[in-house]
Each structure stands twice: as structure tokens, then as C-alpha cells.
Amino acid sequence: MSAVLKDPIPAPGRPESTRPEPRPGVLAIEAYVPGKSHAPGVEKVFKLSSNETPLGPSEKAVAAFAEAGRKLEDYPDGSATVLRQAIATAYGLDPARIICGAGSDEILNLVAHTYVGPGDEVIFSEHGFLVYKIATLASGGTPVVARERDLTADVDAILALVTPRTRLVFLANPNNPTGTYLPFDEVRRLHAGLPANVLLVLDAAYAEYVRRNDYETGLELALTADNVLMSRTFSKIHGLAALRIGWAVGPAHVIDAMNRVRGPFNMNTPALLAGAAAIADAAHVEKAVAHNARWLPWLTEQIEGLGLKVTPSVANFLLIHFPDTPGRTAKEADAFLMKRGLVLRQVASYGLPHALRMTVGTEEANHLVVAALADFMSGNSSAGQEAGGKDK
């Protein structure tokens, strides 16, 4: 007996369409735009737009990556066993409390997909990482933005926004793109003020760079509380951004729930092995910390000496503020620097249209940026068209 074909009936609440349509809300999401990598027409480019380490990855990680390339026909370990064990060894953790993902971006998206749905609310600070909003909307939730104080997360402002619909609070500590941080007493106060059914997600992507006595990553809180997850990344100090490696630690019930949503082979073998080698190379990490400790204050002092404001940073980048004056704006500065092969990050999408974010670079790049900004602020646009090119 042949089947009877019927005209399709539009889903309730959706208009008839002649093509597949995404579910409501998807097209309202502003796609993430990464930092630029190129400067058109410039011979030598210094990418200072994405907060990557200027020292590159550990040689041990590079060797592990190369070795992994000898056996690409096999599926990766879906449980990321070798990487979770390496992380556990480095931090004295139970590997069962660790989940790994393709960058901390995947971790943040996983936690949103696991705990957030239509009608739920997610709180984050007004200049917080853009992925928080994207992950919330992609899960069908409602973003709730807390005002900051002096470009720093405000615990009281966050707690004032908590409602019975709140499911998650994202806190970047240190924060990107401002470089500011909350002392851990404030983080504890935030946690103490949250209902037990609200998950606090501490995004500590830049934790290794912080050298402040009142700072903690949140690791201990993630191990002892039932509603705290701490996420980390290999993209910054470990120099493995191209491999997309992130991880998180938290309560067993949270990790179990996230693993049920996680894809079965969400990380590739080269990433797993390179990440395991990188986290075991403490000497390489210390070199990166020392480089940043040398150049972050130097850049801050030099740039402030040009009459520009720099938000005090504890990370591996600076937020540079420009006047809203024709010829001196952040957008014009970005174009000026780009012509010299110096690629910084515009942060208007973060609600900071008058600022640029600069990664701490190599010694050469740092000096070139300061020299270029000096020319820009003085109106000397003809001095050296390229940072390292033929026109200099």
C-alpha cells in the first residue's frame, strides 16, 4: 500500500516558509568576530590582537604533536584520558573531576547547553567575554548584564540581578578585554550570595599571568562547593591556540552532566598529546610569565607617557583608551597601526568603542607599538610606513 503524501503543516508559532529556518532567536545572535591576523599590503606583520604568547609553545609540546601525526587513522581517546591525567598531576586533582574540550569556548558552551534553556537567565558583567552571551542565546536562555565598576566586575551588581530564573553566573577572572580582576575575597562573597542551585562558572583563562597576593584561580572553591566550575585554557600561556584545548574542574555531578552533552570525540589526538606535554613543562610556563612580568609594566608606563590612559592589567594584554577627538580616536589609531603591520584589537563589540586591546608581544613588537603610538599622537603619520617592511 502506497503512502499518502500530505502538504506540510507549519509548526505552531512559525510562519510558513519555502526553506529550512533556524529556531527563533538564532539569527539574533551576533557571530563572534576574532581578532585580525593580517595587515593588507604590509610585508611584516605583528599580530597583537588575540592574546597569544609571543614565546610560542613548549618544544616538548611540539615534539608530542609531531609524534601524534604518525597515527592519524585512529579515532582519538574520547575520554581525553592522557590529558586529564596530565592536568590532574600538575594540579593534584582527581582526573574524574576534569572535563576537556576544544578550547575553553567549548567548555563554556557545554555548560550553557547543559544547564540553560528557554526562560532561564545567565548573568555576566557588561565587558565580559563575548562567548558568554553567545552561549546563553544559543541555549535559548536570556542574557542578563551586570554593570561594572571601574571596568571591574561588581559583586553587588551581579547579586542584585539574581532571580528565581537565574541558572548560571559567568565570571572571567581576570577579565578579557579589560585585564582587571576580583580579589578572591570578593569571589567568595559572590559565591556565598548565590542560591545553591545557581552554578558559578569561573573563567580563569589568564590565571597563570596573575601575580597578586589577593588572587586565586577558584580551584579550591570548584573542588569544595557543589555549584562552582572553574575553566582554563591552553591557548594563552601554553601557546597552543591552534590546537583548541580547554578544560574545567568542578563537582562530580556537574562534570557528569556536561559529559552527557559533550560530543564523543570532541578533541583530536595531536591536541591531547601536545596539551599533556605542555602542562608538564613548567619551565616554559615560567619563561612566559617572566616575559610578561617584564614587558607589561614597561608598556603601561610608556603608553601612559604618551598621554593615553591604560587600564591596570594583570593579564598578558593592555586596554588602551583613546580620546573621542577627530584624528586621535581608537578607530583611527587602529588604522594607523595597521599600516605599520601592528595588528591590535578593536573592542567596540565589548562596549568599549574608544579603546584598543594590545597583547604583550615580543621585545621588537612592543617597541614598535610605542614608537607608532608616539607618532600617531604627535600627528607624525609619515615616519616609517611599515614596522618591519620595505618602506620603513
UniProtKB/Swiss-Prot annotation:
Question: Keywords in UniProt for this one?
Answer: Amino-acid biosynthesis, Aminotransferase, Histidine biosynthesis, Pyridoxal phosphate, Transferase
Task: State the name under which the record lists this protein.
Answer: Histidinol-phosphate aminotransferase
Top-rank taxon: Bacteria
Q: Which GO terms describe its biological process?
A: L-histidine biosynthetic process
Reaction it catalyzes:
L-histidinol phosphate + 2-oxoglutarate = 3-(imidazol-4-yl)-2-oxopropyl phosphate + L-glutamate
Region entry Disordered: which residue ranges?
1-24
Q: Which residues carry this modification: N6-(pyridoxal phosphate)lysine?
A: K236
Q: What is the lineage of its organism?
A: Bacteria, Pseudomonadati, Pseudomonadota, Alphaproteobacteria, Hyphomicrobiales
Q: Which HAMAP family match?
A: HisC_aminotrans_2
